[in-house]
């Protein structure tokens, strides 16, 4: 091996115009230097290489490794000057016999395909490239999100738009118009701000959460009621990097249906309260048991009449009772009569007010089967 390595190292540090050349032919390495600004011609470089390796009588091909690790040929003045100018800081030259040379080995990515050449070109630090993970991306940047779903009404929607610092516009236009509000005095028309147009391919259209004719209610927590169109526009521009818009969608069918804790319970409680105070027999008569229906009928009748008529209900012949509703009716009437005397004194006033509406014809409130108590029951007897 040539011992001029230390000399070339000195040239590299003290002479910035010198380019160190490391040539390889087979298992031999040679080192020499060239002038970066005046490298000369390719013929002179060719003669220098073959003279340095003592192969003057052999036809060879010369190639070099560029900064990207690709093996490129040196066969004219242009690519020779390019090779010298791109050397940083070392120009690696490879020499092969022409009959043994593979001309298809030159080109981009050739050194990465030839393992033996790669080992000779690079040291350990450059040879071990990190493996490129070409797969589905793991870190997605959010474009939009729906927030405050729990605290907003179902007819409203709060959308957050993310721009991530790039110059892509928000992608929608707004206009002023007239909206209808429910006030204590009725429906009133008030000024409102609406989305007039969506820019195709814009940020707002790509989210799918905003649409034309959606009414803008708030911008970053500030209500737009009472503000002009220019003021709302300035508010959106000032908060465009993190815009939070509360809208009332024009198409309410796309809203998320949530289970309301107040609406569902209030409906059920109202229904149950009304059923107890309006018509006690209405809910019971929908069932298939006639005994409960007759018991409820006794409550209505006995609450409106005098107590001395109650024993007549018990004096009905057992045959007629069994023919109407069975033998269990007598026991049900007896239990209901005992509970009526205790509860009638407490709610006597409310029962009388309710029964006043049923006095004209109690048959209409009692849906009884044909051939039942209608003939022998207490409703006809009393």
Curated annotation (Swiss-Prot):
Residues 134-151 form the Pseudo-CRIB domain. Residues 254-295, 311-330 are annotated as: Disordered. One of its GO terms (cellular component) is plasma membrane. Keywords: Cell cycle, Cell division, Cell junction, Cell membrane, Cytoplasm, Membrane, Tight junction. Residues 18-98 form the PB1 domain. GO terms for biological process: cell division. InterPro entries: PAR6_homolog (IPR051741), PB1-like (IPR053793), PB1_dom (IPR000270), PB1_Par6 (IPR034868), PDZ (IPR001478), PDZ_sf (IPR036034). It comes from the Eukaryota. Its main location: cytoplasm. Residues 158-251 form the PDZ domain. CDD domains: PB1_Par6, PDZ_Par6-like. Disulfide bonds: none annotated. Interacts with PARD3. Interacts with GTP-bound forms of CDC42, RHOQ/TC10 and RAC1. Interacts with the N-terminal part of PRKCI and PRKCZ. Adapter protein involved in asymmetrical cell division and cell polarization processes. May play a role in the formation of epithelial tight junctions. The PARD6-PARD3 complex links GTP-bound Rho small GTPases to atypical protein kinase C proteins. The pseudo-CRIB domain together with the PDZ domain is required for the interaction with Rho small GTPases. Belongs to the PAR6 family. This is Partitioning defective 6 homolog gamma. It comes from Mus musculus (Mouse). The gene is Pard6g.
